[in-house]
Amino acid sequence: MAVGKNKGVSKGGKKGSKKKVVDPFTRKDWYDVKAPNMFKNRQVGKTLVNRTQGTKIASDGLKGRVFEVSLADLQNEPDAERSFRKFKLVAESVNGRDVLTNFHGMALTTDKLRSMVKKWQTLIECSVDVKTTDGFMLRVFCIGFTIKDSMSQRKTCYAQHSQIKNIRAKMTAIIKREITSTDLKGVVEKLLPDSIAKDIEKACQVVYPLHDVYIRKVKVLKKPRFDLSSLMELHGDGGGKAAEVSTGAASGVVVDRPEGYEPPVQASV
């Protein structure tokens, strides 16, 4: 054993053992996450962020966060048709204690996708890159499965290669037609009832009967330059209170005062 003083014991233990433990949550604040006005439930949830300290601003830590929410929660309708679709919302601006979000993507849950794949049928899928009228570049994935005709006696319902190519071409054409003619808000409104997939299923019946046709995933590849006014319109604030306040301040308002009114004397200026 080494001879000499044990500095750690003489000082009462290891260095830093008496340091006070600070709860990290005391330095954080809660913010409300707000969904755009395309959805019925605007209050998505809450998120934590460190308070503004020095050069670290709290709003900068919130911007860019992605929240994944089930469509059933966004629409306040917990039915089976909505629960397996997940929407991604990205934080783009902070207004007071509200985090204003915008659409960032959509996908089906894994269990729904796995449950649709079965034997004795053909899986047909396609992906298309399309641009909306307001400059968003989206990659849209579509999936569908062949189904046995009611008059058929066969066990299987496999489509021929030429039929698969024809169906895939129809999928691509319908997706391009529906998305290139509208803005991002219109795309989301079409994704909510999945009207694009229903149009594809109806159009492909002449080639081969399909079922379980869905827009499987939507990715946002590119965005236009951030515009606060368009984001406020999505959240129902465009031309609202802020516009009224600015208009009133510019035009001036006549205020009734009692006779002999004198303004109060201020202690400091």
Swiss-Prot record:
Entry annotated with the keyword Ribonucleoprotein: yes
Keywords, comma-separated and alphabetical: Cytoplasm, Ribonucleoprotein, Ribosomal protein
MF (Gene Ontology): structural constituent of ribosome
Chain segments carrying region Disordered: 1-20
One Pfam match: Ribosomal_S3Ae
GO CC terms of this entry: cytosol; cytosolic small ribosomal subunit
PROSITE patterns assigned to the protein according to its UniProt record, in alphabetical order: RIBOSOMAL_S3AE
First and last residue of the signal peptide: none
Subcellular localization, as worded in the UniProt entry: Cytoplasm
SMART domains xref list: Ribosomal_S3Ae
Keyword S-adenosyl-L-methionine: no
UniProt record, GO biological process: translation
Domain of life, per lineage: Eukaryota
Assembly: Component of the small ribosomal subunit. Mature ribosomes consist of a small (40S) and a large (60S) subunit. The 40S subunit contains about 33 different proteins and 1 molecule of RNA (18S). The 60S subunit contains about 49 different proteins and 3 molecules of RNA (28S, 5.8S and 5S).
Function, in words: Has an essential role in oogenesis.
Similarity comment text for this entry: Belongs to the eukaryotic ribosomal protein eS1 family.
HAMAP family for this protein: Ribosomal_eS1_euk
Name of the protein in its database record: Small ribosomal subunit protein eS1
Organism whose genome encodes this protein: Anopheles gambiae
Classification lineage: Eukaryota, Metazoa, Ecdysozoa, Arthropoda, Hexapoda
Gene: RpS3A
